[in-house]
């Protein structure tokens, strides 16, 4: 009975003794979520969701509100740290075969999509030049849907162009979606602890478990402290490091930026969208670039769960990481040679990973059987 008591959960939660630092990113993500929720609430108090006042209200927050510049910069920088942590978290899951816990993986993918939607709505709110044009380009993709496209776009905009109703509903969505993220995170954690965390070897952890506290809780605290230190270093020395310079100008529908792009953490998906010279094809590729993660648990063919003992799969995995970084880089560049060619090539390699890895798993099984 005492083992079930909530006060003793941190003491008695059994965890595999060999889980590495890659398992700390879940707690770092929760820290980012807490930071975002708190700073977001205080920013919402002073923000005005009106196209004539939004830009001025952000300036008012940074200049006139006590510690407003700290809240605004923490909110912006921790959004970037949030995505860095979540991409590492997903990469860890792919490398160590954690996707075989299907419920946890699929709830996590749903979380990622919700998070991306929330970040997109938030990017529009300052009503800067790049915010406005990125919103115009991305929402305009809905017109690629046959028959319903134009109606859906007009419905989303609240008119025939991005205007005051669009900003108001984007603010409402940006405010409400974090609560959906908190709920989904709770489901994600409950599902994870229902079966228990895996380990780098991909074996059953039941034979060797230790209490979560103090062994892993201190490790979590070290990584969280390191992340918050990095956050404050960026905040203190280069707060606009991850911002787009175009967003220091108020949105102007009559002037198009030379190169429209979203925030850096969406560039991989935007690069895939841009590499296809067809609107519907690009939109489908954009959606598939994230949705393809849901297929991974169902296409696993290897007898071994983790990639730790599969050198061929490891090579393919690191190719995927290099591809992801390259797509992000090319998407930040103008649409001109050689960036278009590089973007198209890396997009093909990105999708090829998800097709090749099951075939490679099957080939590795054959090699293992031959050796035996």
Curated annotation (Swiss-Prot):
Names of the cofactor(s): heme b
Species source reads Naja multifasciata
Gene3D superfamilies cross-referenced by the UniProt entry? Cytochrome Bc1 Complex, Chain C
Protein's name according to its UniProt entry? Cytochrome b
> Which PROSITE patterns did the record assign?
CYTB_CTER (PS51003), CYTB_NTER (PS51002)
Protein keywords: Electron transport, Heme, Iron, Membrane, Metal-binding, Mitochondrion, Mitochondrion inner membrane, Respiratory chain, Transmembrane, Transmembrane helix, Transport, Ubiquinone
InterPro entries per UniProt:
Cyt_b/b6_C, Cyt_b/b6_C_sf, Cyt_b/b6_N, Cytb/b6-like_sf, Cytochrome_b, Cytochrome_b_C_euk/bac, Cytochrome_b_N_euk/bac, Di-haem_cyt_TM
Cysteine-cysteine disulfides: none
- The family this protein is said to belong to: Belongs to the cytochrome b family.
- Name of the coding gene: MT-CYB
Q: Please give the Pfam families that the UniProt record associates with this protein.
A: Cytochrom_B_C (PF00032), Cytochrome_B (PF00033)
Task: Please explain the role this protein plays, according to its UniProt record.
Answer: Component of the ubiquinol-cytochrome c reductase complex (complex III or cytochrome b-c1 complex) that is part of the mitochondrial respiratory chain. The b-c1 complex mediates electron transfer from ubiquinol to cytochrome c. Contributes to the generation of a proton gradient across the mitochondrial membrane that is then used for ATP synthesis.
Does Transmembrane helix show up as a keyword for this record? Answer: yes
Name the GO terms of the biological process aspect.
mitochondrial electron transport, ubiquinol to cytochrome c
What membrane topology was assigned to this protein in its record? Answer: Multi-pass membrane protein
Q: What does the subunit comment say?
A: The cytochrome bc1 complex contains 3 respiratory subunits (MT-CYB, CYC1 and UQCRFS1), 2 core proteins (UQCRC1 and UQCRC2) and probably 6 low-molecular weight proteins.
């Amino acid at each position: 009975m005492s083992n079930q008591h909530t006060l003793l959960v941190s003491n008695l939660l059994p965890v595999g003794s060999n889980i590495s630092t890659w398992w700390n990113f879940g707690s770092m993500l929760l820290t980012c979520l807490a930071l975002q929720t708190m700073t977001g609430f205080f920013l919402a108090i002073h923000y005005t969701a009106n196209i004539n006042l939004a830009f001025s209200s952000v300036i008012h927050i940074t200049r006139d509100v006590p510690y407003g510049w700290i809240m605004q910069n923490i909110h912006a920088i921790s959004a970037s740290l949030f995505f860095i942590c979540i991409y590492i978290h997903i990469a860890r899951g792919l490398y160590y075969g954690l996707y075989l816990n299907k419920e946890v993986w699929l709830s996590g993918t749903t979380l990622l999509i919700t998070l991306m939607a929330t970040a997109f709505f938030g990017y529009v709110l300052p009503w800067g030049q790049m915010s406005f044009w990125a919103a115009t380009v991305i929402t305009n993709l809905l017109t690629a849907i046959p028959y319903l496209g134009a109606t859906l776009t007009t419905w989303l905009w609240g008119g025939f162009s991005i205007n005051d109703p669009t900003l108001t509903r984007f603010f409402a969505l940006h405010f409400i979606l974090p609560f959906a993220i908190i709920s989904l995170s709770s489901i994600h954690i409950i599902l994870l602890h229902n079966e228990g965390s895996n380990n780098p070897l991909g074996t059953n952890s039941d034979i060797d478990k230790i209490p979560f506290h103090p062994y892993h809780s201190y490790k979590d605290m070290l990584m969280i402290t390191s992340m918050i230190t990095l956050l404050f270093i960026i905040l203190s020395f280069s707060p606009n490091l991850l911002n787009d310079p175009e967003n220091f100008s108020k949105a102007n529908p009559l002037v198009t930026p030379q190169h429209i792009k979203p925030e850096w953490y969406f560039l991989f998906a935007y690069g895939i969208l841009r590499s296809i010279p067809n609107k519907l094809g690009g939109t489908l590729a954009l959606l598939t670039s994230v949705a393809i993660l849901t297929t991974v648990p169902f296409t696993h063919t290897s007898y071994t769960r983790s990639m730790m003992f599969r050198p061929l799969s490891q090579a393919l995995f690191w190719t995927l990481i290099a591809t992801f970084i390259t797509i992000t880089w090319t998407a930040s560049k103008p649409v001109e040679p050689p960036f278009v060619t590089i973007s198209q090539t890396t997009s093909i390699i990105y999708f090829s990973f998800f097709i090749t890895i099951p075939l490679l798993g099957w080939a590795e099984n054959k090699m293992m059987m031959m050796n035996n």
